[in-house]
């Protein structure tokens, strides 16, 4: 192992089975950057952040400038390059950069917090999870940049990763060469309730659009809702799926091919094993990354508490029509129904009452000169277009491309076309 810093352990470059060159970084960073003195589960004041640096083969790896990819979520690790991972978008980036894939703190190989009793009690684990937001993720990135001896680097943020990019611009714009954001501009200056009012309206419209395309599915969804209301709808694993959790199938509509995937699911017999198996794997939240549900609302909290905002802010029209679908709207009862989330409920309750600090400084954002480009998806049901454009207008060097061609996952689904468009836009090669 070679060391660029006493706190950094870096491997040598090696070839991977995908034909890429890869090296691994492990960096020790402070857990608590807020000064409250919180400690890691092992009693230390530090955690480890892992990053995988990737370069195209056949070149000197350091010959291309560095770009950090910040993953969506929150609570999800960076993607792992593999032959069947659908990472054609990564290939497009590697034509111009070497890419650093960071597992954000608490995920993947970065001191993962993967059990509700990780810190010994719900209260202690909740305290631990308060340190997994964009503010401290950005400071981890800064520590890694410094440890690698880099003066500047570029960023690409997808969804929540774009929130991290915005925080980075707010705090350390001088460290950034160029920034790219895909479906991920936060709602600076807006409350979480305002955000959910917009996303619920987007999901109402998306639901109606879906039923216009597949009219029979409204009756199918109504029947499933009746079964769910009687406690008769279950996954193959035996979890009871209530009416509200059933609605979360609407999250499928936020990605490429999601409408067809939902339609194919609803065509199946609700009593069949295949339906119940696919249902369990299609529901939003839970599963492999419980953090996605547990800390989800915190990513929208630019100060204040969240207090189960998605549950509080839901419009009356959703109460009247059980066939209207929801998206990234976490409801408390979903924790009670999902065996994977149930142990996290006490932690989630504590986080819902936590007083979150502000994340963004509009004055500093307005003073930045970093060039960049953002893809704003007109049909995005997860990140509202109106607040996205308001935030983009605060950042002088950020050019926006508004498109209805892609859903929220356009960066991945386009196979690199979105990134190439943003690169040309940021460089001034195209105007929009």
Q: What residues fall within each predicted segment?
A:
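Alpha/beta-hydrolase fold active-site neighborhood
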Residues: 231-357
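Gly/Pro-rich cap/lid or specificity-loop segments adjacent to the active site
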Residues: 4-8, 12-236, 359, 363-364, ...
């Amino acid at each position: 192992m070679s060391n660029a810093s006493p706190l950094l352990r870096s491997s040598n470059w090696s070839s991977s089975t995908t034909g890429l060159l890869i090296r691994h970084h492990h960096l020790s960073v402070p857990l608590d950057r807020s000064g409250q003195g919180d400690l890691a589960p092992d009693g230390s004041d530090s955690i480890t952040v892992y990053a995988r640096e990737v370069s195209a083969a056949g070149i000197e790896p350091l010959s291309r400038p560095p770009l950090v990819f910040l993953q969506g979520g929150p609570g999800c690790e960076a993607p792992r390059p593999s032959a069947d991972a659908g990472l054609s978008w990564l290939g497009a980036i590697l034509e111009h950069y070497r890419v650093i894939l960071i597992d954000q703190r608490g995920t993947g190989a970065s001191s993962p917090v993967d059990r509700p009793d990780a810190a010994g009690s719900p209260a202690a684990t909740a305290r631990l999870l308060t340190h997994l937001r964009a503010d401290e993720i950005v400071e981890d990135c800064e520590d890694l940049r410094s440890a690698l001896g880099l003066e500047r680097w570029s960023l690409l943020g997808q969804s929540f990763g774009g929130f991290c990019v915005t925080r980075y611009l707010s705090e350390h714009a001088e460290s950034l060469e160029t920034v790219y954001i895909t479906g991920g501009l936060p709602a600076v200056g807006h409350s979480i309730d305002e955000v959910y009012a917009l996303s619920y309206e987007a999901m109402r419209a998306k639901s109606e659009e879906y039923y216009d395309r597949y009219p029979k599915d409204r009756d199918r969804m109504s029947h499933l809702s009746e079964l769910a209301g009687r406690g008769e709808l279950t996954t193959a694993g035996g979890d009871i799926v209530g009416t509200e959790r059933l609605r979360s199938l609407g999250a499928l509509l936020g990605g490429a091919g999601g409408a067809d995937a939902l339609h194919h699911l609803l065509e199946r017999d609700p009593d069949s094993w295949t339906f119940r198996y696919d249902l369990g794997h299609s529901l939003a939240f839970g599963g492999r990354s419980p953090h996605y549900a547990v800390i989800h609302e915190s990513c929208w909290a630019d100060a204040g508490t969240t207090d189960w905002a998605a549950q509080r802010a839901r419009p009356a029209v959703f109460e009247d029509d059980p066939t209207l679908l929801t998206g990234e709207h976490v409801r408390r009862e979903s924790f009670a129904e999902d065996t994977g989330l149930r142990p996290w409920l006490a932690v989630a309750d504590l986080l819902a009452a936590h007083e979150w600090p502000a994340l963004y400084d509009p004055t500093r954002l307005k003073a930045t000169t970093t060039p960049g480009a953002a893809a704003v998806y007109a049909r995005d049901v997860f990140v509202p277009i109106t607040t996205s454009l308001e935030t983009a207008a605060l950042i002088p060097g950020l050019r926006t491309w508004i498109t209805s061609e892609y859903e929220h996952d356009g960066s991945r689904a386009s196979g690199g076309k979105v990134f190439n468009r943003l690169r040309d836009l940021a460089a001034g090669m195209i105007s929009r």
